[in-house]
């Protein structure tokens, strides 16, 4: 056991984490050069295309130093804010972490967020300055930044280039010498933390565990503490990026995959503890929170008869991603669908894309919302995720909305743009710190509702892509909020309702109806598009009717004949307007998402 090292890699997006992992795998000879593909740890196509890591992967490496054999378990972590939950549980399974920082970019917001998770778990952190082969690399400046912002001593920082392979051996040696061996006890009852689970078509639900005490052998009867169910261990494997390696036992301090032959991943929930049925441990592994969805959106199949297919697809995705939650809902405008909860916007995009790709569905997503707390006049408190659930105005005492604590790091020249953007989004500044004369760190409290739409895009475009952003949930605060409804031809379109601050309602309503006017197809009768708060209409646009030339067949003759035909047409249009229905195209829903 003293020769085991469990470590993970922490880095901001694009600082070269997956490439560094590839290099370590290659150096230890875990994968032959023929089988090596770039970003071998990123198994989903969508991960490789977007260049991000979504699911945490693991790999067991063998390394020899001074004639001794060591086992290095590399536990990969995603870098994006939405997946910080995956990060926290990956880090809970390690004793050490490599803090990878790009030698030309310096410290970014997510680097800081993940380092704090690592420090809370008391990990040994080794600073690694990557990409030293770049012409713009300035390792010394980056070391100073790490010391200033995070307060880590960088005298032992290791400079590497994952691309050329420089410094990789030195890094492996540092992992062995500086990361502590697992502190665990063979004699205690078995205790293992499930830090990932996924579904395999042949083997069923698999649990990736880190063993803290004791051991697990093939054919043992184990107890999953969260569900209190017993299962037989059918197989044990060590993780490997290409094909897992079978083993008869997994010992203390090790990382491995347990096959229990389960049909459902909810039986091996991430964060649960596995122990032996005959000698169970008293306490589960602590310090572990469930993922809570923050952003909710309605997802509907474009073809209404595909509802059951969508349910199956969500069930299957839930097997791999325990952080999504969903329940069926109906909309007058869109038919049957689901209200799905996500960790954030990127998570929502990725899930929607995976549903469309992997299950061949055509979907439409409504505007994302957050969970509001509504205090009613009778003292009852409602938690709502869908604007259409909001009670009548006269029953509402107040509406509270969730706030997030955000960290933004930006070059000083864009400071003005960012402060303007944050003030427009009702942000409250809590801290401002110059890391270097060129870069500044801002901390703001912002309503979650203001960042779920397009905040990230706006932030990037107002700083030419240089700012980095990270957030964590803070608390609920009272807000001056109203529900904005959109009516088309007098009927409220429930899927387009949103909750907005009263001060922005007027302008938001105007923008809404303008955008809708461009999209609603012209009918044979005129269509009014209105934005309303309660019964009060605050904005209106009209889509003009298409006219048929009813007088075309009259050649010359009496004017009264023409007038009679035009009057008849007018009557018909009136009748049509009273009973006519307008079918809204898909773009109508998407365009509303884009309105700032």
Swiss-Prot record:
Q: What is its main location?
A: membrane
Enzyme Commission number, as recorded: 3.6.5.n1
Q: Where are the bilayer-spanning segments?
A: none
Localization annotation: Cell inner membrane
Give the binding site residues for GTP: 14-19, 130-133
Coiled-coil stretches are none
Q: Which Pfam families match?
A: EFG_C (PF00679), GTP_EFTU (PF00009), GTP_EFTU_D2 (PF03144), LepA_C (PF06421)
In terms of PANTHER family, this protein maps to:
TRANSLATION FACTOR GUF1 HOMOLOG, CHLOROPLASTIC (PTHR43512:SF4), TRANSLATION FACTOR GUF1-RELATED (PTHR43512)
Kindly provide the name given to this protein in its UniProt entry: Elongation factor 4
Task: Give the organism the record lists.
Answer: Campylobacter curvus (strain 525.92)
Gene from which the chain derives: lepA
């Amino acid at each position: 056991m003293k020769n085991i090292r469990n470590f993970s890699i922490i880095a901001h997006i694009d600082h070269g984490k997956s490439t560094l992992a590839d290099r370590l795998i290659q150096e230890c000879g875990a994968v032959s050069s023929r089988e090596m593909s770039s970003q071998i740890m990123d198994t989903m196509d969508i991960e490789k295309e977007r260049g991000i890591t979504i699911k945490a992967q693991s790999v067991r490496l063998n390394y020899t130093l001074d004639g001794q054999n060591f086992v290095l378990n590399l536990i990969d972590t995603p870098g994006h804010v939405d997946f910080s939950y995956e990060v926290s549980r990956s880090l809970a399974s390690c004793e050490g972490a490599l803090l990878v920082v790009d030698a030309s970019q310096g410290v970014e917001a997510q680097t800081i967020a993940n380092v704090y998770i690592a420090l809370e778990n008391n990990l040994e952190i080794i600073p690694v300055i990557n990409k030293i082969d770049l012409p713009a690399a300035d390792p010394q400046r980056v070391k100073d930044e790490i010391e200033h912002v995070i307060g880590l001593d960088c005298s032992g920082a290791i400079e590497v280039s994952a691309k050329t392979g420089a410094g990789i051996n030195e890094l492996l040696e540092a992992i062995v010498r500086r990361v502590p061996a697992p502190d665990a006890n063979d004699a205690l009852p078995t205790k293992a933390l499930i830090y990932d689970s996924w579904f395999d078509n042949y083997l069923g639900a698999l649990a990736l565990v880190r063993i803290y005490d004791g051991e697990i052998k093939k054919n043992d009867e184990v107890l999953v503490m969260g569900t209190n169910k017993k299962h037989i261990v059918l197989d044990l494997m060590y993780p490997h990026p290409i094909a897992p390696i079978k083993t008869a036992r997994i010992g203390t301090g090790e990382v491995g995959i347990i096959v229990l032959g389960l049909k459902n991943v909810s039986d091996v929930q991430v964060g649960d503890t596995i122990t032996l049925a005959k000698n169970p441990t008293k306490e589960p592994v602590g310090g572990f929170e469930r993922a809570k969805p923050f952003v909710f959106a309605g997802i509907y199949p474009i073809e209404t008869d595909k509802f059951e297919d969508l349910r199956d697809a969500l069930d299957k995705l839930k097997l791999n991603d325990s952080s999504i939650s969903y329940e069926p809902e109906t909309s007058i405008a869109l038919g049957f669908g689901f209200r799905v909860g996500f960790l954030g916007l990127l998570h929502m995009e990725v899930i929607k894309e995976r549903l469309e790709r992997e299950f061949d569905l055509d979907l439409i997503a409504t505007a994302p919302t957050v969970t509001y707390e509504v205090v009613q006049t009778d003292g009852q408190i409602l938690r709502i995720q869908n604007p259409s659930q909001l009670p009548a105005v006269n029953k509402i005492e107040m509406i509270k909305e969730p706030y997030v604590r955000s960290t933004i790091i930006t070059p000083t020249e864009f400071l003005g743009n960012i402060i303007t953007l944050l003030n427009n989004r009702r942000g409250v500044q809590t801290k401002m710190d110059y890391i270097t004369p060129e870069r500044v760190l801002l901390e703001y409290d912002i309503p979650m509702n203001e960042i779920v739409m397009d905040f990230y895009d706006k932030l990037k475009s107002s700083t030419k892509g240089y700012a980095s952003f990270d957030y964590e949930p803070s608390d609920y605060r009272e807000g001056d909020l109203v529900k904005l409804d959109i009516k088309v031809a007098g009927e409220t379109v429930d899927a387009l309702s949103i909750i907005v601050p009263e001060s922005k309602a007027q302008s938001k309503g105007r923008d809404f109806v303008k955008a809708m006017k461009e999209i609603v197809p012209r009918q044979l009768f005129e269509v009014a598009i209105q934005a309303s708060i309660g019964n009060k209409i605050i904005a209106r646009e009209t889509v003009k009717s298409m006219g048929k030339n009813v007088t075309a067949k009259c050649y010359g003759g009496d004017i009264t004949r023409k007038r009679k035909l035009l009057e008849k047409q007018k009557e018909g249009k009136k009748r049509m307007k009273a009973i006519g229905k307008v079918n809204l195209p898909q773009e109508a829903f998407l365009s509303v998402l884009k309105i700032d």
